[in-house]
A protein has these predicted regions:
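Bacterial N-terminal signal peptides
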Residues: 14-27
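Surface-exposed repetitive/solenoidal architectures
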Residues: 29-203
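Bacterial N-terminal signal peptides that target proteins for export
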Residues: 2-15
């Protein structure tokens, strides 16, 4: 009888220990899931309004901000009167999702001008349509409708409008660097320049 009682006590003790382990483990799992969700939220950025796009452009003044981040364009946008001056530097993934951004007007003094000024190596810009004009004043070098300088991948993008500069002017990109890839992209409109101009890339 004592042996049965000892066995029962041991079983209850083991069961209690198991319950304590589970009670301590579950909050850890919950915390891990929460951290994963927070990380996923930080790694994506959705653009549904012009203000969202302006916020993206401001954030991308820091070269590293867009790295490992995916940006989704969720709606067509009209930029007329918005003051949008281009996205300074982009290193992530931009999913245009077939949407159109109209009213682009890049007419300030400068060089390396485009909807994206610099598309960095490893970046991807896909399924995006831009309508407007990329016509800076001043030195006016390295001008494109989608990118001023491209070292990433531009896929299935279209520019409809005018690209104009003094040199290195393209409908899609002003300059396509050695690491840059431009595929399935088209231009409808005009490209003006004195040296190194092209319908897709100036050089």
């Amino acid at each position: 009888m004592n042996r049965i009682s000892d066995l029962t006590r041991r079983l209850w003790a083991a069961l209690l220990a198991l319950c304590l382990v589970l009670a301590l483990t579950l909050p850890v799992f919950a915390e891990g899931e929460s951290e994963t969700a927070d990380t996923a939220e930080k790694e994506t950025f959705h653009i549904g309004t012009v203000d969202d796009l302006l916020q993206l452009a401001d954030s991308c003044r820091l070269d590293s901000w867009s790295k490992n981040r995916t940006v989704y364009l969720d709606a067509d946008l009209e930029l007329t009167g918005s003051g949008f001056a281009g996205i300074p530097s982009f290193s992530g993934v931009f999913e245009g999702q077939g949407h159109t951004i109209s009213g682009l007007s890049l007419v300030d003094d400068g060089s390396v001008i485009g909807f994206f000024r610099y598309v960095q190596q490893g970046a991807n810009v896909r399924d995006l349509v831009i309508r407007g004009r990329s016509m800076p004043t001043g030195s006016r070098s390295t001008v494109g409708g989608i990118a001023g300088s491209n070292a990433g991948t531009l896929h299935n993008c279209r520019f409809e409008g005018v690209s104009s500069g003094a040199s290195v002017v393209g409908g899609i990109a002003g300059t396509n660097l050695a690491a840059g890839v431009i595929e399935s992209c088209t231009t409808t409109g005009s490209v003006y320049g004195a040296h190194f101009i092209g319908g897709i890339a100036g050089e």
